[in-house]
Regions:
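Tubulin/FtsZ superfamily GTPase core signature
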Residues: 1-399
């Protein structure tokens, strides 16, 4: 039997990350900057200038004849036509992959129109496809929201799993004085975290290993999914990180309806088995008793006194998802939020090109931003959100 040297060991699953359009391309650049290893990066865009500035390993100019390299003009149908024109190039770039991430910022032209075409080609090749899409801010206007709704509905039909990230919820996690361009930069970075949180479960060597087969078992034909990341340090870091992961303000619906859960605990040399067990108990208690649960533990020596927990929840039935989303929309559509949106819209030029916002601001870490627990009502501060939602749903059933 031949000897396998450490330098010869590589990830056997081929993972490709495709950034489609401006926001998707920015997410790819951030992943490259973050040193995400074991994956191949592809940027696809109708905008030739944006592609020129991309750090991706492979760059594909979509629809040369359709757009002339000048972009899709915020029209998803132009993005769709451009992707169909370049279908053979897309297919060649995706060949050989076991898993493909399609990342888009829904609402624009290229990402919204071309994203689902890329996913469709990948599925035709028998590849496991995960879509990660951000929803636009309310202040970006009704037209962009309609574009996003159409894009997400199309993407959902052509992926195994779809993770949607609502940009409006970023407003719960950042300072109100944060400049507009920096807010878009933060939104782009959420895409990076969505992809990195899943891919590292496969590419990073673990103390308790997860592999591609584990991820595929949870994410194949899974439909809508939730992702949460929690970070904590100190005496109660395991419970705090687990709670943050399942109650992140970026999670649109409760985790308790999940039929499949994949989570990973990452820590330094001081991480203990009892901490892994503590985190596992919190996460498993939040989901269906019949849920298929797979977990791993990864050692990162550079993490001193800190635990990071990544949770991927899938297998929600559509009725549950729609019901809970309706509750969330009603909770966020307050007169105050409506008034704030009107004020912002009146001062915003929505012809803004924010794809290069990363170059304008410092590359400070925003990782902790997504792991803060959602604000609770004062009289229910000790009751986790998922338990309140479960109690509410059970009450409706009894009635």
């Amino acid at each position: 039997m031949p000897e396998v040297k450490p330098s010869d060991i590589q990830t056997f699953a081929s993972i490709k990350v495709v950034g489609v359009g401006g926001a998707g391309g920015s997410a790819v650049n951030r992943m490259k900057d973050a040193g995400l290893s074991g994956v191949h990066f592809i940027a696809m865009n109708t905008d030739a200038q944006a592609l020129h500035n991309s750090k991706a390993d492979i760059k594909i100019h979509l629809g040369h004849s359709t757009t002339g390299g000048l972009g899709a003009g915020a029209d998803p149908h132009v993005g769709e036509a451009a992707a169909n024109e370049s279908r053979d190039e897309i297919k060649d770039a995706l060949q050989g992959a076991d898993m493909v991430f399609v990342t888009i910022g829904a609402g624009g032209g290229t990402g919204s129109g071309a994203g689902y075409v890329v996913a469709e080609v990948a599925r035709e090749l028998g590849i496991l496809v995960v879509g990660v899409a951000t929803k636009p801010f309310s202040f970006e206007g009704e037209k962009r929201r309609q574009n996003a709704d159409w894009a997400i509905s199309q993407l959902r039909r052509h992926v195994d799993t779809l993770i949607t990230i609502p940009n409006d919820r970023l407003l719960q996690t950042i300072d109100r004085r944060t400049p507009l361009l920096e807010t878009f930069k933060i939104a782009d970075d959420v895409l990076r975290q969505g992809v990195q949180g899943i891919s590292e479960l496969i590419t990073e060597h673990g103390l308790i290993n997860l592999d591609f087969a584990d991820v595929k078992a949870i994410m194949s034909n899974a439909g809508s999914a939730l992702m949460g990341i929690g970070r904590a340090s100190g005496d109660n870091r395991a419970s705090q990180a687990a709670q943050q992961a399942i109650e992140s303000p970026l999670i649109e619906v409760s985790i308790d309806g999940a039929k499949g859960v994949l989570f990973n605990v990452t820590g330094g040399y001081d991480m203990s088995m009892s901490e892994i067990q503590e985190a596992a108990e919190i996460i498993t208690s939040a989901v269906s008793p019949d849920a298929n649960i797979i977990f791993g533990a990864t050692l990162k020596p550079e993490l001193e006194d800190e635990l990071i927990i990544t949770v991927i929840a899938t297998g929600f039935d559509s009725a549950y998802f729609q019901e809970t989303e309706t509750e969330e929309v009603e909770a966020t559509n307050t007169p105050l939020n409506d008034r704030m949106t009107e004020e912002v819209v009146s001062h915003v030029d929505m012809n803004l090109d924010h794809t290069e916002s990363a170059a304008i601001f410092n590359e400070e870490s925003t990782e902790n931003m997504w792991s803060q627990p959602a604000e609770q009502e004062e009289d229910e501060s000790d009751t986790p959100a998922f338990l309140r939602r479960r109690k509410k749903r059970n009450k409706k059933t009894e009635e």
